[in-house]
Regions:
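Non-catalytic terminal accessory segments
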Residues: 1-126
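Hydrophobic alpha-helical transmembrane segments in integral membrane proteins
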Residues: 103, 114-140, 156-162
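Soluble catalytic domains of enzymes that build or remodel membrane lipids, polysaccharides, and related
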Residues: 136-364
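Short N-terminal secondary-structure initiator segments
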Residues: 1-6, 124-131, 191-199, 224
Length: 364
């Protein structure tokens, strides 16, 4: 199934687009072939990323290649949608044949439309949305807490140190009591993270940071990710807990990529046997699956990420149907959930119909 999605469907889409480019552009065969070749090479860079080929390139070249490769998949998606709409229009006789063949005005219109969509998407991505959230404990707490929550930073070739620095400044401006990160801090390769010394940026955070692993830490290599978290001063919780003020318990789950991770009920039961005052339980679980199990275990609040809410429409429609909650607040019995669409991004830096965000919560 994954091979079909990653390889076969994109090849079919590129063939479909290439055919339309050949019949639509009023250019010589050489120019048409050159344009198609550029598109194919751009998309090929996406697979170079999976093969870690960028690690052998100069950092600036690797960053540019990553941007081109991961952006191409979104350009491909929108071109397919546009050509499908035009083809459907032709079938029902709403679009004349002349509109589709050797028509430079149509090609220019499509280019301008895509340019507008992606300029908007990039501006929207860079506008990080501050999401306020209320959390209420059924038990008494020593005081009120301000918590900043985030997920899916994906630092690396795509999100370099200068972007991470901007996020650190935004979080520090909130003056939180502590910070929670629900996985995927690292995008993939450790090379840009180490070469740009990104751990130094996390040391600028003015509050303690608690985090869990995401699936992308498994891509980068868990041992290397764990060492980076240690160097960055992040409290990494892998099926273990941290206690704040003898009343708030933060449990970080191993990512479900590890199929042998401990069940949430076992983690809670173990804590109940060791800690008498579990006044409020927070769980960090990167992927928002099996929410019923967190509810049954008596979790007060769970923070997740992973979905990105699809990043762009109409993929957001798919994620909304794949998950019980693909984004935002959700309540199940006495358990409150928040699934973040992420402060960072994987793929092209476009947010279309979704948002990049960080959560500022008040726990009372």
């Amino acid at each position: 199934m994954w091979m079909l999605m990653i390889l076969v469907l994109p090849l079919m889409a590129m063939t479909y687009i290439a055919w339309h480019v050949r019949v639509m552009l009023p250019l010589s065969a050489l120019w048409k072939s050159a344009i198609i070749a550029v598109g194919v090479l751009s998309f090929a860079m996406l697979f170079l990323n999976f093969r870690r080929a960028f690690d052998g390139m100069p950092l600036s070249v690797a960053q540019m290649a990553y941007e081109v490769g991961t952006s191409s998949i979104i350009v491909l998606l929108y071109l397919v949608m546009i050509f499908l709409l035009l083809d459907l229009g032709r079938l029902v006789h709403l679009v004349p044949k002349s509109f589709m063949y050797h028509n430079g005005y149509t090609a220019l219109g499509i280019f301008v439309l895509l340019l507008g969509i992606f300029i908007y998407g990039n501006l929207h991505y860079n506008n990080k949305v501050r999401v306020p959230l209320e959390m209420k404990s059924q038990n008494s707490l020593p005081r009120e807490y301000k918590i900043v929550m985030a997920s899916d930073l994906h630092i690396g070739y795509h999100n370099p140190r200068k972007e991470l620095a901007r996020w650190v400044d935004m979080i520090n401006a909130e003056n939180p009591d502590f910070i929670l990160i629900a996985g995927d801090i690292i995008d993939g390769s450790m090379r840009p993270v180490l070469e740009e010394r990104m751990a130094e940026e996390f040391h600028r955070l003015k509050a303690p940071v608690y985090a869990c692993l995401g699936n992308h830490e498994f891509y980068s290599g868990v041992p290397g990710a764990k060492q980076f978290y240690k160097d960055a001063g992040i409290h990494l919780l892998i099926d273990e807990a941290a206690v704040i003020d003898s009343s708030i318990v933060i449990i970080g789950r191993d990512d479900r990529t590890n199929m042998r991770r401990k069940p949430i009920k076992d983690l809670i039961d173990s804590l109940n046997s060791k800690i008498s005052n579990l006044n409020y339980t927070i769980v960090l679980d990167h992927q928002p699956y099996n929410l019923d199990r967190a509810e049954a275990a008596g979790v007060d609040f769970q923070l997740s990420g992973h979905t990105h809410r699809g990043q762009v429409w109409p993929i957001s429609w798919i994620t909304d149907r794949l998950y019980e909650c693909s984004w935002g607040s959700h309540q199940r019995g006495n358990t409150q959930f928040y699934v973040s669409s992420g402060i960072g991004i994987w793929g092209g830096k476009f947010r279309i119909g979704t948002q990049s965000e960080y959560v500022v919560a008040t726990l009372k």
